[in-house]
């Protein structure tokens, strides 16, 4: 396979080849005409057709193709892709977390109240029990 005389295609040009009779894929920066392979593809032709018009590298790698499958690709190679025509992937940026209050005083007070209020209720209940027991005796 000689890359010297192979054409460089734009994404728009490759995207036009998206039918069962004319199917091109972009994998690893290279363009492949897989039209003749559609019927023989173990995953069916729909899998290949759904990957047209975009960079199908991730789709190809996610399946985990064998070395034999990778070697077969050479016979379908028609050229390279102009990488400047492929839209850049947007990276996931997690939402910024709100800054937490460095002054922990309100949280500290809440924790104390969570401990003291039930303790006060328990103390009040014990006091009422003792008072009512001593009244009846």
UniProtKB/Swiss-Prot annotation:
It is a single-pass membrane protein. One of its GO terms (molecular function) is heme binding. It comes from the Eukaryota. Residues 6-82 form the Cytochrome b5 heme-binding domain. InterPro entries: Cyt_B5-like_heme/steroid-bd, Cyt_B5-like_heme/steroid_sf, Cyt_B5_heme-BS, Cytochrome_b5. The chain crosses the membrane at residues 108-128. It is found in: Endoplasmic reticulum membrane; Microsome membrane. One of its GO terms (cellular component) is intracellular membrane-bounded organelle. Membrane bound hemoprotein which function as an electron carrier for several membrane bound oxygenases. Belongs to the cytochrome b5 family. This is Cytochrome b5. It comes from Oryza sativa subsp. japonica (Rice).
């Amino acid at each position: 396979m000689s890359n010297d005389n192979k054409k460089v295609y734009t994404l728009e040009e490759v995207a036009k080849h998206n039918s069962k009779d004319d199917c091109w894929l972009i994998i690893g920066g290279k363009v492949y005409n897989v039209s003749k392979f559609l019927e023989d593809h173990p995953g069916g032709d729909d899998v290949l057709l759904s990957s047209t018009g975009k960079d199908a590298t991730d789709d190809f790698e996610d399946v985990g193709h064998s070395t034999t499958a990778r070697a077969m690709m050479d016979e379908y190679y028609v050229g390279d892709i102009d990488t400047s025509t492929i839209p850049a992937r947007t990276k996931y940026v997690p939402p910024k977390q709100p800054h937490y209050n460095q002054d922990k005083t309100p949280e500290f007070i809440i924790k104390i109240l969570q401990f003291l209020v039930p303790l006060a209720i328990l103390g009040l209940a014990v006091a009422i029990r003792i008072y009512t027991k001593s009244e009846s005796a």
